[in-house]
């Protein structure tokens, strides 16, 4: 599975999890004991035990690699990627750039909700740095560590991905994990100094999201083994954490916003479930209790759309109750097309139409997030 932090977070999605997975995807953070271990079953990563020769070994293409693949898919880190031997392209693939936009958007929503963002050079620059922390650094960290611990699943579902295929060595993967993590935390600390915070809230959001990402993917907790807890953690990483980071950067993170974004994270749970359907075979084989495995595809697809739709309708009702009539109507207007697309694609066949459904429905969802952010800023 792939995995969403204030940035990071969550997402993790296109690999064995899905496109929304682990997400400012402030997501996982490996402890200092993270090491590289060559055994097929790795509770931890043990760089110290890795053969030094692996760092210089050239990437290889498996004998059974697909005859053709898309270079574009490879760069985005999604299924159907072309086999690549360029180590930097492989590194980029592991970070799954396709999962960065939700985190970047979350930062934008948080900045809008603060009511204090201005189109000045300084504010725009600060927001870009926050987006870099949430997307390339912390989401990239989350996706890489998720792929590391998912290699057994990927060996079943997508055996030609970089790690199970041997296209990148163990030491190279571990190095990437630490560079992205430390880079993201460093940017978080820089943003706190830049914003003049007495308490380094952005740094701690990044640290917390990184830890969440780690326990999402790694044993012994491995939250993703539970469909409810894992997918909610993913939703929070992709929606809540980046929003909080953006709002804290330009304003004050208030309790009502925390509650509202946690509610929205339930919709993120539903979106994360979409990605579980394509991994049902590998999840069942390895004992992961994703919702499609636990409840069956028919029930799980209704849980999925229910989480997405009921959450947005609840937020619209909340906005209406606070006198934000036009914002509530706008959110309702953005929810209706999602329901139509669910019946048109997802509910018919969640495996066949998962990509088409997400590509067509998610734009309405993310604009609904922005509508909510603008409503709370007034």
Swiss-Prot record:
Outcome of swapping residue 147 to A: Total loss of activity
Known catalytic reactions: phytyl diphosphate + chlorophyllide a + H(+) = chlorophyll a + diphosphate
InterPro entries attached to this UniProt entry: Chl_synth, ChlG, Prenyltransferase_related, UbiA_prenyltransferase, UbiA_sf
MF (Gene Ontology): chlorophyll synthetase activity
Source organism superkingdom: Eukaryota
Enzyme nomenclature, EC number: 2.5.1.62
Modes of activity regulation: Inhibited by N-phenylmaleimide (NPM) and diacetyl.
Membrane topology classification: Multi-pass membrane protein
Known cofactor(s): Mg(2+); Zn(2+); Mn(2+)
Pfam families xrefs: UbiA
Protein family according to the UniProt entry: Belongs to the UbiA prenyltransferase family. Chlorophyll synthase subfamily.
Function text: Involved in one of the last steps of the biosynthesis of chlorophyll a. Catalyzes the esterification of chlorophillide a with either geranylgeranyldiphosphate (GGPP) or phytyldiphosphate (PhyPP). May also use with a lower efficiency the monophosphates GGMP and PhyMP, but not the non-phosphorylated alcohols geranylgeraniol and phytol. The tetraprenyl diphosphate must bind to the enzyme as the first substrate and esterification occurs when this pre-loaded enzyme meets the second substrate, chlorophyllide.
Record text about domains: The N-terminal part (1-87) is not required for enzymatic activity.
Name of the protein described by the UniProt record: Chlorophyll synthase, chloroplastic
Gene label: CHLG
């Amino acid at each position: 599975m792939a995995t969403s932090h204030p940035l990071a977070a969550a997402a993790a999605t296109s690999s064995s999890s899905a496109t929304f997975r682990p997400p400012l995807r402030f997501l996982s953070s490996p402890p200092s004991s993270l090491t590289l271990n060559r055994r097929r079953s790795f509770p931890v990563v043990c760089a110290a035990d890795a053969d030094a020769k692996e760092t210089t070994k050239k990437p290889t293409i498996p004998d059974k690699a697909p005859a053709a693949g898309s270079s574009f898919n490879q760069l985005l880190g999604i299924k159907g990627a072309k086999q690549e031997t360029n180590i930097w392209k492989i590194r980029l693939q592991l970070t799954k750039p396709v999962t960065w936009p939700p985190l970047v958007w979350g930062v934008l929503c948080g900045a809008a909700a603060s009511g204090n963002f201005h189109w000045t050079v300084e504010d725009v620059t600060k927001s870009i740095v926050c987006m870099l922390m949430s997307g390339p650094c912390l989401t990239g960290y989350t996706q890489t560590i998720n792929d590391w611990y998912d290699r057994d699943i990927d060996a079943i579902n997508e055996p030609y991905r970089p790690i199970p295929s041997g296209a990148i060595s163990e030491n190279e993967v571990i190095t990437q994990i630490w560079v992205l993590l430390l880079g993201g935390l460093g940017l978080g600390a820089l943003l706190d100094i830049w914003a003049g915070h007495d308490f380094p809230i952005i740094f701690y959001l990044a640290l917390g999201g990184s830890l969440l990402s780690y326990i999402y993917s790694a044993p012994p907790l491995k939250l993703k083994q539970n469909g409810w807890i894992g997918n909610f953690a993913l939703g929070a990483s992709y929606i809540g954490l980046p929003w909080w980071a953006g709002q804290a950067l330009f304003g004050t993170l208030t309790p009502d916003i925390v509650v509202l974004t946690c509610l929205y994270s339930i919709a993120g749970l539903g979106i994360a479930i979409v990605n579980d359907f394509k991994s049902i075979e590998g999840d069942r084989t390895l004992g992961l209790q994703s919702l499609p495995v636990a409840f069956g595809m028919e029930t799980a697809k209704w849980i999925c759309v229910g989480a997405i739709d009921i959450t947005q309708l609840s937020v619209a009702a909340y906005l209406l109750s606070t006198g934000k009539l036009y914002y509530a109507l706008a959110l309702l207007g953005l929810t209706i097309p999602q329901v139509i697309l669910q019946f048109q694609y997802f509910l018919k066949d969640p495996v066949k139409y998962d990509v088409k459904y997400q590509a067509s429905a998610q734009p309405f969802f993310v604009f609904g997030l922005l509508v909510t952010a603008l409503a709370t800023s007034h």
